[in-house]
Amino acid sequence: SSIIKDAIKDSYKRLIFPSIEREIRSDLTILANKVAIDNFSSNVSNLLLTPPMKEIRVLGFDPAFRTGCKLAVLDKNGSVLSIDKIYPHEPHNKIKESEIKIVELVNKYNIDVIAIGNGTASRESERFIANTIKNNSLNCKYVIVSEAGASVYSASDLAIKEFPNLDVAERSAISIGRRLQDPLSELVKIDPKSIGVGLYQHDLKQKELDEALDFAVGSVVNSVGVNINTASPSLLKYISGLNSKTIASIIKEKERINKFTSRMELKKILSDKVFEQSIGFIRINDAVNI
């Protein structure tokens, strides 16, 4: 009858179809969220696995216009040797003075590579550095480095604790330089969501994203391993079996003896279980048994 047909049409249009549509949309959203998180994790892993440039002296260059370009001279181990600032761009245009300062730093500290951040004024800074190297026949090269997340790290409690006497921009120049020397050690200090290699993170389920990214970072760190003599607490916290208490014990012991020469020395400060869980991911580069 027409009443039954009308009832069927109404129920399909008003109840059944919207319900099916919501269910399909929900399934697709869940799938899209999973794919996006997997993509985010994969990108983070690939970035962290960028090969380090060991044994090079770096000049970290954080470009800017009005506030000036911040410079950080780093030795082969990433230790800060000098901090400076130049104003080669608008509105100052102190090109000659800036060029003299770059030449002075490169020659004084035997700089191998100048790491230029890819943010504001990056193109102008690249042109300035290229001309400076060419005009003065400097024996160094320059590289453009992603500075995504550098500002986040520079303003963090970790950065303030590490460099309490420097301002945010100066810490950023240090971070840019260290990213070239050892990307893994530097990038683990930054929340993976701030590195800028995935979709807009606030569109994704935060708990699932945090867990996936934490797992990705931990997997990379344990896959590569860490040099116990140079690793920061930010890096050590991802090593299987270690926690804040054991990390503090390792750092205290390292400060006491200056450097570890054998992994067996860790047995003095780690329990048998923790030693068993963590030792496979710890390296001592100049030891007989790495």
Regions found by a protein language model. Give the residues of each.
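Extended, highly charged clamp/arch subdomains and adjacent linkers
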Residues: 1-57, 76, 99-104, 108
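Short glycine-rich, Thr/Ser-proximal phosphate-binding strand/loop in the N-terminal lobe
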Residues: 74-93
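Non-catalytic alpha-helical coupling and interface elements of nucleotide-dependent molecular machines
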Residues: 17, 49, 111, 134, ...
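Conserved phosphate-handling catalytic cores of large alpha/beta enzymes
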Residues: 94-113, 120-225
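Short coil/turn segments at secondary-structure boundaries
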Residues: 19-28, 56, 60, 117, ...
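Helical mechanochemical/support elements of P-loop NTPase systems and associated helical scaffolds
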Residues: 20, 33-36, 40, 44, ...
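Gly/Thr-rich phosphate-binding beta-strand-loop-beta motif of the actin/hexokinase/Hsp70
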Residues: 52-80, 180, 271
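Accessory alpha-helical DNA-binding modules that contact the DNA backbone or grooves
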Residues: 223-290
